[in-house]
A protein has these predicted regions:
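Hard-cation-handling environments
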Residues: 310, 315
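Metal-cofactor-binding active-site regions of metalloenzymes
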Residues: 2-300, 352-354, 358-370, 374-477
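Divalent-cation-assisted or electrostatically stabilized phosphate/pyrophosphate-binding catalytic cores
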Residues: 334-340
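C-terminal amphipathic alpha-helical interaction region
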Residues: 304-306
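Short, basic/hydrophobic alpha-helical segments
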Residues: 343-349
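A short acidic, glycine-rich active-site loop
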Residues: 279, 328-334
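Short secondary-structure transition/capping segments
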Residues: 43-44, 317-319
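Short glycine/proline- and charge-enriched loop/turn segments
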Residues: 319-327
Length: 477
């Protein structure tokens, strides 16, 4: 029997162990998509306790922020909401999480937590209800007194070279500017352009948001569709000046429905007048804006990330109580492969297709995405159109293996830009280590089985590429 999470954790062959320890383990991290706070990076926040880091909670502005993976674990163990997002003391909240964790057998949360405890806190034991007090005291002592345990310290000891945050077009990026001007910050932090609120014409709050966008670009209001595209272009250019390498689109599904500018303008005027738009009208507007944005991304060398097939806020009662991104989302089954291809084809018609990374929350879409990739590659960069890393509910061993196997079967795994945390926690960089172990085990098994040669030079290039080098090239770091 193997020891629990020893140095060969998840590395099931000699080749896998060699690839991981020789090439993967010490590579820098490019965390090109996450949800961490640039303010906390600049201010070099020091957390008071492990519950603040792991469980989050109410923020000073009244919003909720935290790891909703952990919140779902607690809810699934019958923990009352007052211990999850409520006002119970942090020590009690941590106790409830520790009591739930042993139930996570086979769940990546169990591995992630123990990887974090070992790497950052030197704890070699097992977290459960009985050890919670010991772990609480150990972690809090380090968080409060160890200079390497501030936000910047955690990033630096994780060997992170690049962080791509997620930012709204109306954000002034003041914290990014401060980070950029601070010579003591050795890693790069760049904004990512997330214009969902300007695209979701069918959702409540659209007209109000467009009013805010108008103010940011110095207008009283955005009177027509040309004004909208001009405003978005102005904001993209500002983001590019601040070092933006990627955009991100969180879509229910990827639409494609052609329309003239006049049609789209009429739809926009209708929405701004407070009238409801039909699903068909929304798709026409969204398609028009996505094509415009894609062309701007191409011009400015910004990658376009498409996240889709998530059905959000399905528990109406809890979503109304706590708001979005609090753990009430699920995998959707929208079929939009043809629309994705049509969008890329429209951009390709004028040689203005940007680098694109496609993520579906539904793993049933893996093979479809894999076949789309090969239709739109070009000489601009190897792997210009990417199948994004196993996302959200799929960033576990089976999901990661399936995504990489699908990519290997239908495209070039060797050009994959690799892992991202998509996280709100500064301890989550261990997920890159988790991914690297799974990657090396997968490739190592192919070598052990005689399906790929034991070619040291080729294997080094592939492993280092997927761990960091491909992302460095892709995002022009």
């Amino acid at each position: 029997m193997k020891a629990f999470m020893d140095k060969e954790f998840m590395l099931q062959s000699p080749v896998a162990q060699h690839l991981y320890h020789t090439y993967a383990a010490d590579m820098p991290i490019c965390d090109y998509h996450c949800h961490i706070s640039p303010k906390e990076i600049y201010e070099n926040r020091r957390f008071e306790n492990i519950a603040q880091v792991w469980l989050g909670g109410r923020q000073p502005d009244g919003s909720l922020a935290g790891d909703h993976y952990k919140w779902r674990v607690m809810r699934s163990n019958g923990v009352p909401e007052e211990y999850i997002t409520g006002t119970k003391p942090d020590r009690e909240r941590f106790q409830k999480f520790a009591e739930a964790l042993p139930m996570c057998v086979g769940n990546p949360m169990y591995h992630w937590c123990h990887l974090e405890l070992r790497k950052f806190f030197g704890y070699q034991g097992v977290l459960n209800g009985d050890t919670a007090e010991e772990v609480w005291n150990l972690c809090n002592d380090k968080l409060q007194h160890d200079d390497s345990m501030t936000v910047r310290g955690l990033i630096e000891q994780s060997n992170v070279a690049f962080i791509g945050t997620t930012d709204d077009p109306i954000d002034d990026l003041a914290w990014h500017k401060k980070i950029k001007e601070d010579p003591s910050i050795k890693f790069t932090v760049a904004p990512s352009f997330r214009p969902d609120k300007a695209i979701n014409i069918q959702k409540p709050g659209f007209a109000e948001y467009m009013g805010k966008l108008a103010q940011v670009v110095g207008k009283e209001k955005l009177e027509c569709i040309n004004c909208v595209t001009d405003a978005l272009t102005q904001r993209i250019e500002f983001f590019a000046e601040m070092g933006c390498r990627a955009s991100d689109h969180g879509l229910d599904y990827v639409p494609y429905r052609e329309a003239t500018k006049e049609e789209v303008n009429a739809i926009y005027q209708k929405a701004m007048a407070g009238e409801a738009v039909t699903a068909e009208e929304a798709e026409k507007y969204q398609t028009y804006i996505l094509i415009h944005l894609g062309k701007q991304y191409h011009r400015l060398n910004i990658a376009m990330q498409l996240h889709y097939n998530c059905l959000r806020g399905v528990n109406r009662k809890m979503n109304a109580l706590l708001g979005p991104d609090t753990g009430f989302d699920m995998i959707n089954t929208a079929k939009c492969g043809g629309e994705i291809a049509a969008l890329l084809s429209a951009l390709n018609d004028t040689d203005e297709c940007p680098k694109v990374i496609i993520y579906s929350l539904n793993p049933a879409d893996n093979e479809q995405i894999g076949t789309i990739l090969g239709c739109f590659q070009s000489t601009e960069v190897p792997g210009k159109i990417q199948h994004g890393s196993a996302w959200w509910f799929n960033d576990q061993k089976i999901g990661m293996e399936n995504q990489m196997k699908s990519l290997a079967n239908l495209g070039l795994l060797g050009n994959f830009v690799g892992m991202l945390t998509d996280s709100r926690s500064f301890l989550s960089y261990t997920r890159h280590d988790y991914f690297r172990r799974i990657l090396c085990n997968l490739i190592g098994q192919w070598v052990e089985d005689g399906e790929y040669p034991d070619d040291e030079k080729a294997l080094e290039k592939i492993v280092k590429g997927i761990c960091f080098d491909n992302a460095k090239r892709y995002f022009a770091l």
